[in-house]
């Protein structure tokens, strides 16, 4: 039962007198999806040159992703010049402070860089990758004003372990990613306080039976949560299913979406880099063909996991409760009394039917919530 912006009750039995009750048939009601790794969507991206520009872009991005079931997200910046990152973090903080109750929550910032391995840059601009700096961390923390949620770092870089320790002490979730780290170096990062891995399998050494690398280190450590880009492109569906089976309570479905999400094929930007969308695949426009984010949305991520053989409840958890826990969003990711009324309604085939944020309908293209059969309170059997 939804009462204003919160869920007031969950369970079976007759409704209270005066309650509006909807018969949704065989449709599924689930917590709203939470995306920890999203760079853009609907034609806008997170990185920007003015605080207000960034704030407006982040809010527009969140509203686009709400049309695909995302009710909260962590706005993710790519590596950039120091002053641009500081501006971007300030803009994300401004977006996070917006109070529109019908707008998806911006939970804070995820910095994917700049302290990454140049050899594993992927679609990060190599020009902006640099050595870890405590001074830069301090400036970013000050700019974020308590909204810096995650930082991705390559733990083998000089000074990385000190950054991990300082950031964790400040309440930031430190994530291993874009790295050449071996198994032991990854475990050392975990010992220093890192508790997350950015897009497992991508931009890191693969899993090998004699060189297990960061993939095995993460899956073997029950303290560690792992992101999976569940588009069937970044990771083969069989490997998605394997990772989910290995860490069903620790896997996090993410989109890694860029500005092109929701748009037609063509050329777009990821930070300063030119990228090309063709079909569902985004790659750097230059000849390497390196994957450059995605046009994935969270509703499709859940459906992709289920199609790969992941149990529905496990797939939903990876898009809701687990990312909520990583982001410290205790009122989100669950259907329980007192939780935020962030809800998605899915068709039996998992197509999104409606999105509710804070008790307000923000997406209902088929007018389901207007047309669903009403059951008069007290008359349901």
Model-identified regions with their sequence ranges:
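Non-cysteine beta-strand/loop elements that form the S-adenosyl-L-methionine
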Residues: 31-35, 106-115, 151-152, 194-201, ...
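Metal-associated gating/positioning segment near the N- to mid-region
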Residues: 27-84
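Conserved, mostly hydrophobic/aromatic
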Residues: 37, 65, 111, 167, ...
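His/Asp/Glu-enriched, well-ordered alpha-helical/loop segment
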Residues: 213-226, 232, 244-339, 343-346
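C-terminal cap of metal-dependent C-N hydrolases
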Residues: 334-381
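Divalent-metal coordination cores built from histidine and acidic residues
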Residues: 62-147
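Histidine-rich, glycine-flanked metal-binding segment
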Residues: 1-31
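Active-site core of metal-dependent hydrolases
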Residues: 138-265, 284
């Amino acid at each position: 039962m939804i009462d204003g912006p919160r869920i007031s009750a969950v369970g079976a039995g007759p409704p209270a007198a005066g309650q509006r009750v909807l018969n949704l048939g065989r449709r599924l009601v689930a917590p709203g999806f939470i995306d920890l790794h999203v760079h853009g969507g609907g034609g806008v991206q997170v990185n920007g040159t003015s605080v207000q520009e960034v704030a407006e872009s982040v809010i527009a991005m969140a509203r686009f992703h709400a049309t695909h079931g995302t009710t909260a997200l962590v706005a993710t910046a790519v590596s950039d010049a120091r002053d641009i990152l500081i501006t971007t973090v300030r803009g994300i903080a401004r977006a996070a402070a917006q109070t529109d109750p019908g707008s998806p929550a911006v939970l804070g910032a995820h910095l994917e860089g700049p302290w990454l391995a140049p050899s594993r840059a992927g679609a990060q601009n190599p020009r902006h990758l640099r050595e870890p700096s405590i001074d830069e961390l301090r400036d970013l923390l000050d700019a974020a004003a308590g909204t810096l949620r995650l930082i991705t770092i390559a733990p083998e870089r000089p000074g990385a372990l000190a950054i991990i320790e300082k950031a964790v002490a400040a309440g930031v979730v430190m994530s291993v990613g874009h790295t050449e780290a071996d198994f032991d170096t990854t475990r050392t990062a975990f010992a220093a306080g890192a508790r997350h891995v950015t897009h497992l399998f991508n931009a890191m050494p693969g899993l090998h039976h004699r060189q297990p690398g960061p993939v095995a280190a993460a899956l073997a450590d029950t303290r560690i949560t792992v992101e999976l880009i569940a588009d069937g492109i970044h990771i083969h569906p069989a490997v998605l299913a394997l990772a989910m089976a290995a860490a069903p309570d620790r896997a996090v479905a993410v989109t890694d979406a860029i500005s092109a999400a929701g748009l037609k094929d063509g050329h777009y930007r990821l930070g300063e880099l030119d990228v090309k969308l063709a079909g569902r695949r985004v790659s750097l426009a230059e000849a390497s063909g390196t994957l450059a984010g995605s046009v994935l949305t969270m509703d499709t991520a859940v459906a992709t996991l289920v199609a790969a053989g992941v149990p529905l409840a496990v797939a939903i958890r990876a898009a809701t409760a687990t990312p909520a826990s990583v982001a410290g969003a205790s009122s989100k990711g669950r259907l329980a009394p007192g939780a935020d009324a962030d809800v998605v309604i899915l068709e039996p085939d998992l197509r999104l039917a409606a999105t509710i944020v804070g008790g307000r309908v923000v997406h209902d293209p088929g007018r389901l919530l207007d047309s669903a059969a009403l059951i008069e309170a007290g008359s349901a059997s």
